[in-house]
């Protein structure tokens, strides 16, 4: 039986807005409306959150991994010499909240790019609820994981009750008012303050002044991670060593040395699992086959099997020492062109259909993500913020030590569900 919780509503249609480290901005179709009066103080409301029967979140972890690899591969091909970091979990949450308002061909295109499992809307919301609960259940001794989702809406626009119910059920997201149409830069400041708080100050600015012109809704997801290694690296064992960058230059990087860690090879890739305290989370460092093309990515299904084998210590997994560079990565990037290239372009045009969100919603005008990832001797600190803006109308392992001395990938994953919290490509560990 589906159980209803967290009911807060106003009349038949709620006027709302929300927050998360991943934000989506949406615009409405038609001519621009007159400048509305200043909105009342911010009010946050929730729809009817349906407590769904417990389902397996792992298919959604697999979906987000496939989506994240697609995005990272496309991004790398457009910028093969730079360090790249993204949060598939955060980006999928921001876009997933938009998907819940999409209909027709727009929904089909978004589902294909997001690799969403084929299901009914009710089953989808149940799966998203299980995924969200798993993410929020990763906290433990030595590990802090904070995930939050929010919808921000201009108070002059009407958000459909059914949409509020869907985001409350799938993402535990509320809707908060912000003066997106009357004072967009003030709304930017409000959203940035919320993102900074949700990421413990790691992302002080997701959006910039002028970035929310003609945006009526912003869907945000925020994700923060601070995790200690199960076995920390000894600082005294960190030493300089050569690293050949994606540009073909040799630089001196600071290599952490430790082990043994579980390692295996599959399809020419060498994978090493570095668990965090408590065993719920792990980093998987992936060294591509020697001589592989610059932006070669592993297959999502194969990567899932590798991470599962490392977590379980399956036959073929051996102990190896590791030399892994320290890194400190930061990015803030628009994802629109990458998502368009992957097949989501209709969602950004006036042919889009977001009538499940509001009769006044037109299309996605903004997809922005900011990420930080710091890997050091004691553990990993990482954060992500995504904003989606919706516009209104108008097997041989080789040496016993595995040295990551050329461009490689890093994946921070939930060992139980396979949910990819962070995914990175290190082209030059000395660059920040």
What are these regions (language model features)?
Residues 106-111, 292-296, 331-334, 383-384, ...:
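Extracytoplasmic/secreted cell-surface and envelope-processing proteins
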Residues 281, 288-316:
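Internal alpha/beta scaffold segment
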Residues 110-114, 233-241, 294-305:
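Short Gly/aromatic-enriched secondary-structure transition segments
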Residues 2-8, 12-180:
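Detector for small/aliphatic-rich hydrophobic stretches
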Residues 366-432:
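C-terminal soluble interaction/assembly domains
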